[in-house]
């Protein structure tokens, strides 16, 4: 959009005071982009199911594969994506690697999402 088009749009604004307040409080584009990328990771149902399981208890790939009726390879692939996105962390105990949520915020985000979904179903 050209500067002239932007100026024209601003002159069409009805509520300048609202625009000013919102502009002042709007986050910068970079964190908004990062949040949208986070939601893309959440957007896969397999990853969402893994997050739900790990919100209950840490688990190894083998147990996650059995729980979700998937191959270990498929689970490992999804865990790699979750780990790269800093949603999941791992710890090794002997030969077994256990996965858990990276922090409580991840579970909180899902709890709010489930609250929203259940609210829509009930109302």
Feature locations, PLM:
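N-terminal leader segment of winged-helix/HTH proteins
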Residues: 1-42
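N-terminal helix-turn-helix DNA-binding core of bacterial DNA-binding proteins
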Residues: 27-73, 97-104
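Generic structural signal for conserved hydrophobic packing positions in ordered secondary structure
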Residues: 43, 75-78, 113
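Residue-level detector of secondary-structure transition/capping positions
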Residues: 58-59, 83, 114
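Alpha-helical residues within the helix-turn-helix
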Residues: 66, 77, 83-84
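Beta-hairpin "wing" of winged helix-turn-helix
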Residues: 83-93, 100
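Conserved segment of winged-helix/HTH DNA-binding domains
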Residues: 100-123
């Amino acid at each position: 959009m050209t500067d002239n088009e932007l100026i024209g749009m601003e002159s069409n604004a009805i509520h300048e005071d609202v625009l000013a307040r919102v502009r002042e409080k709007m986050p910068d584009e970079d964190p908004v982009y990062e949040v949208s990328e986070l939601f893309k990771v959440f957007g896969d149902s397999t990853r969402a199911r893994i997050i739900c399981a790990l919100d209950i208890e840490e688990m190894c790939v083998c147990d996650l594969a059995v729980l979700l009726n998937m191959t270990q390879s498929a689970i490992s692939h999804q865990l790699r994506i979750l780990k790269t996105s800093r949603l999941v962390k791992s710890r090794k105990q002997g030969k077994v690697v256990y996965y858990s949520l990276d922090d409580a915020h991840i579970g909180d985000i899902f709890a709010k999402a489930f609250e929203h979904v259940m609210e829509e179903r009930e109302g």
